[in-house]
């Protein structure tokens, strides 16, 4: 099966590579020539465990190709996936200019029945705009070529995207025709041989499903952070509370870990877009609006705890472990670490940082305003306080007696609740975490 993927960002590159791994002939298209040139020599534009190996293998087998020219591949493909960016506008709405640009180019150049599938996260009603843009271009050409539009939202977790794509919980597809449904069934059949979990539905419902899923997960995170903050005030322990409610089969334990807030490319953007969709339709999403407010507040909690613990940070050296918004990625979009760094620098603190993967991304974003270190022990050397912002596995069991010797003072704020209070207090650290008094 011949497939084109427009956009070689996180969603597009992972999707295209996984389709190729299952035997499809895939061409990934991107307008960024530098990105395509790097992919041709095996350089990945993103970090995702296992992706580089998978890309190189499928390029070697001749199943995965890269180009800047969509027109050159349209004659041969049955399906075109649009996986371009939908950055938020100032009002929180999704900017569809790239999505509609793909639709117009599709309409200007198709010569036979082809399906344009939107993989990007887009507001409800986008498919209508995509279809209208294609039809307008066909009318300009004076041709009547059959086509379909479809919605196939992604549900990939950064750091586990390949596993998620190759063994999905479910695949959601919104279609308008039986013909499109048959093509999408054929495409996804190899991924779901034992249990065909493709859920076909109308397109608006598919578009809404993506936003609803991310909003639900974001809600659980903000809910638990709100509970954690109250636990601190009343003397409860959020870990016990989480266990008490997470074992209820109606609730479940996932996404109930208190911390310093969510970030990344999806939750913040999609929550804002869902709120904006409600406003556009005369409805206030009051729960979702609260989710966003709680998260914005929670991103500062590590800073707030630090200043309560040690007072004025001016002239103090603060070591920060973790920069990415979560482990196993270099993504720093909307990362809580950026909020804390900004507050510390404004207060006159000296900030040292370490992240196993996201150091280059941090330099790209904020430059040399912080000191970049080689490892967690180097980061802690000479520090007055140590902050944990990202729960990388390699941070879980540090050699604390070494850290105790190299730190100038002994303040620790655990923003992800992974360290042992008793052990650290026995070593003389002043330790605080989320959701405990």
Model regions and ranges:
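Structural/interface elements that position substrates and couple domains in central-metabolism enzymes
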Residues: 1-437
